[in-house]
Amino acid sequence: MISQIIPFFEQSPWAFYSYITIIGLLVGSFLNVVIYRLPIMMQREWRGDCLEFLKQPAEKAEDKLNLWLPRSRCGECGHQITALENIPIISYLFLRGKCSSCNTHIAIQYPLVELFTGIISFIVAWHFGVSLQTLFALILSWSLIAASGIDIGHKLLPDDLTLPLLWLGILLSFFDIFINLESSVIGAMAGYMSLWSVYIVFKIITGKEGMGHGDFKLLAVLGAWVGWKLLFVIILTSSLVGATIGITMILLKKTSRGTQIPFGPYLAAAGWLSLLYGEQLNRFYFSFL
């Protein structure tokens, strides 16, 4: 069956782009679940580990929660979301952004994540075409969206996302899917050490922690996928965009100077751009030197 589908998509690229976009919309719906539930699951695990370490009695068993069960419910009235109410974007528009049971407003985040994931998936398919690169670039893209969403909401980049991506990037380099093994391994080490070094120097000078350890791991992930040569592009792009947005928010009084701003989404965006357009960005930056 696959041997028939691939030639069809190669001959009908827009059918392929449309198919991947629809898959992206569906995955976006699942990413909303990941963004919401994974931090809760981690918090429960940490609390349980702390109680065990302190030799304290375990807390009362909570309802089982993972990425699959229980089915999504309205946080206000407990109404279980039906399949028809869970169609990406369409259900939100049909319900006019409200719960069908209690009319509580549904957060705009949900359709936005679905739409954004669909758009990103389309761009990846359009850029790489019918290839293994598309498959793995989609996995990275979707994971970066989930990680960014969690970082924005909780200032946390879960190891459950970053570490599997790190090893997957290195594994793919054995087969030269994006880069070779040498570039991947050096990229991972250099990515981690570069931000770790900045963190240490900043802490020595100011006595404060300027960024989280998850940022080191995320840059290591990106280095493993795009190679050490594009780390400069990722760091420069993420820093410029992050500084611009941060300064703008301060000027507009949307935040204060002491407010922590998650850096993960900027790293993720710069890394994603580097995966697709790294060489072009490299040439653009070095044209100013």
What are these regions (language model features)?
Residues 213-217, 247-273:
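Interfacial loop-to-transmembrane junctions
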Residues 15-41:
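N-terminal signal-anchor transmembrane alpha helix
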Residues 37-109:
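Membrane-proximal soluble regions of multi-pass membrane proteins
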Residues 32-37, 96-104, 144-154, 197-209, ...:
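C-terminal ends of transmembrane helices
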Residues 107-115, 159:
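Select subsegments of transmembrane alpha-helices in polytopic membrane proteins
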Residues 1-13, 284-289:
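Short, strongly hydrophobic alpha-helical membrane anchors
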Residues 31, 35, 120, 124, ...:
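Alpha-helical membrane-inserting segments
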Residues 20, 133-241, 284-289:
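Functional transmembrane core segments of multi-pass inner-membrane proteins
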